[in-house]
Amino acid sequence: MNLNQLIIAFLAPRDPAAYTDTAIAQRLNASRMLDRRCTADEVAIALCDLHKLGLVRMNVNKLDDITVWMITPDGAREWARCGRVTVV
């Protein structure tokens, strides 16, 4: 699976929870489902790509300027279409 698919596999089963790019990168690295470690910056770029496709959405907390990401209904459908793989 590629990074985008794994991000969806991480977020979809945890809906409606939201996570930072750093938290997502840490969890993906801990899962060892990628062939190499990913950085928070790589995850942030992938999240922006997924956002453009309507598969994730972001929410910026205006008090502390932290961006969190969550799955959209379209993202959940894509996750189901791909076999509902879950990142634990």
Q: Where are each of the predicted segments found?
A:
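Short alpha-helical segments that sit at the start of domains
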Residues: M1-Y19
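Short amphipathic alpha-helical interaction segments
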Residues: D35-L53
